[in-house]
Amino acid sequence: MSKLSHSEVLNTIRNGLIASCQPVDDGPMDKPEIVAAMAQASLIGGAAGLRIEGVDNLKATRPTVKAPIIAIVKRDLPDSPVRITPFLQDIDDLAAAGADIIAVDGTDRVRPVTIEAALKRIHELGCLAMADCSTLAEGLYCQQLGFDIVGSTMSGYTGGEVPNEPDYQLVKDLKAAGCFVMAEGRYNSPRLAKTAIEIGADCVTVGSALTRLEHIVGWFADEIKTAKV
């Protein structure tokens, strides 16, 4: 954990960019030391905070940065579609490794641990709690429970075709309801990230467009292939 108080953490990331340093799974950059380097480079570039997946990656990154870290663990479970920080042990491990904010799946889906139990554990361990939601109803429920941050993270990712654009309406609605809002999900250009802040997001997380080199190169390569020469 950084040496910032909870209010200082929120003030530090307010109106700022959160760099999600999550390399492609099992890719050449999927190494804790590389994730830590990504995090440091992101802060040099102007990020206000970081989102780090995995306990080992968090352990490698925390000693190298003072900025707030949102931490998660992703798992693929046989009996639940929930992937983001599904177990209390994940929360324990992330808190011990230095997370400032722990994010959990806030969707209304079958899960191994209730959202209420996850929130209780996060706060007991002295961390701020973030809910990754997909709908306004989920976000409002998590706000009422006492989550410190509500994210649009899961919008478009709980079934059906994934949209191309971010869910601006969800961000607006969450803000109108009084949430501390993290815009997240498909904010893959500076213009889109700027728009998120302009419509009311307290901060915005960007991932693939910053730290997934395979994806970024692919965007360029695919576009070049369509060039008329």
UniProtKB/Swiss-Prot annotation:
UniProt xrefs under InterPro entries: Aldolase_TIM, NanE, RibuloseP-bd_barrel
Protein name, as recorded: Putative N-acetylmannosamine-6-phosphate 2-epimerase
Pfam entry (one): NanE
Role played: Converts N-acetylmannosamine-6-phosphate (ManNAc-6-P) to N-acetylglucosamine-6-phosphate (GlcNAc-6-P).
Reaction catalysed by this enzyme: an N-acyl-D-glucosamine 6-phosphate = an N-acyl-D-mannosamine 6-phosphate
Sequence similarity: Belongs to the NanE family.
Xref: CDD domains: NanE
GO cellular component terms, semicolon-separated: cytosol
Any one GO molecular function term: N-acylglucosamine-6-phosphate 2-epimerase activity
Gene transcribed to yield this protein: nanE
GO BP: carbohydrate metabolic process; N-acetylmannosamine catabolic process; N-acetylneuraminate catabolic process
Keywords from the UniProt entry: Carbohydrate metabolism, Isomerase
Species whose genome carries this gene: Actinobacillus pleuropneumoniae serotype 3 (strain JL03)
Pathway named in the protein's UniProt entry: Amino-sugar metabolism; N-acetylneuraminate degradation; D-fructose 6-phosphate from N-acetylneuraminate: step 3/5
This enzyme's EC code(s): 5.1.3.9
